UniProtKB/Swiss-Prot annotation:
Stated family: Belongs to the nectin family.
Record has Membrane as a keyword: yes
Annotated gene: NECTIN2
Organism of origin: Homo sapiens
Biological role: Modulator of T-cell signaling. Can be either a costimulator of T-cell function, or a coinhibitor, depending on the receptor it binds to. Upon binding to CD226, stimulates T-cell proliferation and cytokine production, including that of IL2, IL5, IL10, IL13, and IFNG. Upon interaction with PVRIG, inhibits T-cell proliferation. These interactions are competitive. Probable cell adhesion protein.
Region described as Disordered: spans on this chain: 390-414, 462-489
Protein name as annotated: Nectin-2
Length: 538
């Protein structure tokens, strides 16, 4: 009993020592309900205006805000208090930097202090004319009753958007690395990042100096390579990245390298022969700046009289033995000189090997085209045959898997034939009679035997004898009594429709039934009996 009593919960009130602890817990819980909402980082442009948001959330009825202050904990002691706002005394800016000229409360608007309860919930502070010294941590603090003091901290960053430019440097051909382009990002904070985009063999050299504005940096990147004619006219791209840019700045630069002429000679086709009149040599030049002079000469010192120099071209009026030499084209510009040589071999007769080679090349191309067309045609034919075989196999599978295309005669047709034999064989109503002539068994009575719907054609013996159609020499002909008069039109119509359906069904099974059927009886057979030989049953 004592143990059970010990397990029962105690119903005694809390001891007096627990009341202060419970009160502290309630106060701490209530204080956590109110918080200060600030941004962890705010960026402002150098020389511009920035707002530092600060809100007391959530609005609590009966909460009294006694004071709002902004402080800079990392500033010197005499500059830590930046701004304050009292419900009755209004705003105050004790620190000379930034001072009242550059600070203001956005919501309170430095009002007279009347009706400021709602305004104090929003303690957003605005800074005008940002300088580099304004960068740092700012603390927004609310002194409230009965919740106590709550605060939030914001980091203010002062950035400066740089000004970018890129330009090419006019350089002259040399064997040493030289700066051929510059990319400059001026007065940025923080310093900009510069890179180059190019397929040339290059390297970049970067320097940083202080900008004209305090706290800014100017970055210069030099695009360096060994200047040559290959680099002249090539476009490279300067890429500048900065946190104030939404996307990197891309600045194209076209390089300009001055170099002496690079010369080559064209026009010789290895088919110069004595007496040829349509020969020409051309001096092809690539240079910067443009060529200023062309000079044609030979290594032998003898210049053919039938060759005439016309600037960059050498026109030959008639080829003779003097052209068996080496021609030299010399080109000059403001940077230097370049030359090229071309050896000429003069033949006695035209060279047909080149024409044959050209014809062989053309023939080979045509043969390749024809072979490709034949191969493509063969592939298409094979694919078509394979497709047709696949479709045919699929159709055969469907035919094998599906139900049979015919069905045996229904018992209903036989029963109807047995019930109305006289109606089927009435010669007087030929328009309603069936297409097939029935036959009878001689050994059975007319009422017991089943009426057949088709019979075989007469044999040769039957055709040669004087028997009636359907009779044979194996037995005596059996007379068929004439049928009763025609029934009513309604019965004949029904019988006609059912007969046509059965006729179509049997024709689908085997078309030979149509060939074996007799035509409709004529008027000459009316009133006569019909006989059938029993030989077909043997």
């Amino acid at each position: 009993m004592a143990r059970a009593a010990a397990l029962l919960p105690s119903r005694s009130p809390p001891t007096p020592l627990l009341w202060p602890l419970l009160l502290l817990l309630l106060l701490e819980t209530g204080a956590q309900d109110v918080r200060v909402q600030v941004l962890p980082e705010v960026r402002g442009q150098l020389g511009g205006t920035v707002e530092l948001p600060c809100h007391l959330l959530p609005p609590v009825p009966g909460l009294y805000i006694s004071l709002v202050t902004w402080q800079r904990p990392d500033a010197p002691a005499n500059h830590q208090n930046v701004a304050a706002f009292h419900p009755k005394m209004g705003p105050s800016f004790p620190s000379p930097k930034p001072g009242s000229e550059r600070l203001s409360f956005v919501s309170a608007k430095q009002s007279t202090g009347q009706d400021t309860e709602a305004e104090l919930q929003d303690a957003t502070l605005a800074l005008h004319g940002l300088t580099v010294e304004d960068e740092g941590n700012y603390t927004c603090e609310f002194a409230t009753f009965p919740k106590g003091s709550v605060r939030g901290m914001t980091w203010l960053r002062v950035i400066a958007k740089p000004k970018n430019q890129a330009e090419a440097q006019k350089v002259t051909f040399s064997q040493d690395p030289t700066t051929v382009a510059l990319c400059i990002s001026k007065e940025g904070r923080p310093p900009a990042r510069i890179s180059w985009l190019s397929s040339l063999d290059w390297e970049a050299k970067e320097t940083q100096v202080s900008g004209t504005l305090a706290g800014t940096v100017t970055v210069t990147s030099r695009f360096t390579l060994v200047p040559s004619g290959r680099a002249d006219g090539v476009t490279v791209t300067c890429k500048v990245e900065h946190e104030s840019f939404e996307e990197p700045a891309l600045i194209p630069v076209t390089l300009s390298v001055r170099y002496p002429p690079e010369v080559s000679i064209s026009g010789y086709d290895d088919n110069w022969y004595l007496g040829r009149t349509d020969a020409t040599l051309s001096c092809d030049v690539r240079s910067n700046p443009e060529p200023t002079g062309y000079d044609w000469s030979t290594t032998s010192g003898t210049f053919p009289t039938s060759a005439v120099a016309q600037g960059s071209q050498l026109v030959i009026h008639a080829v003779d033995s003097l052209f068996n030499t080496t021609f030299v084209c010399t080109v000059t510009n403001a940077v230097g000189m370049g030359r090229a040589e071309q050896v000429i071999f003069v033949r006695e007769t035209p060279n047909t090997a080149g024409a044959g080679a050209t014809g062989g090349i053309i023939g080979g191309i045509i043969a390749a085209i024809i072979a490709t067309a034949v191969a493509a045609t063969g592939i298409l034919i094979c694919r078509q045959q394979r497709k047709e075989q696949t479709l045919q196999g699929a159709e055969e599978d469907e035919d094998l898997e599906g139900p049979p295309s015919y069905k045996p005669p229904t018992p209903k047709a036989k029963l109807e034939a047995q019930e109305m034999p006289s109606q089927l064989f009435t010669l007087g109503a030929s328009e309603h009679s069936p297409l097939k002539t029935p036959y009878f068994d001689a050994g059975a009575s007319c009422t017991e035997q089943e009426m057949p719907r088709y019979h075989e054609l007469p044999t040769l013996e039957e055709r040669s004898g004087p028997l009636h159609p359907g009779a044979t020499s194996l037995g005596s002909p059996i007379p068929v009594p004439p049928g009763p008069p025609a029934v009513e039109d309604v019965s004949l119509d029904l019988e006609d429709e059912e007969g046509e359906e059965e006729e179509e069904y049997l024709d689908k099974i085997n078309p030979i039934y149509d060939a074996l059927s007799y035509s409709s009886p004529s008027d000459s057979y009316q009133g006569k009996g019909f006989v059938m030989s029993r030989a077909m049953y043997v």
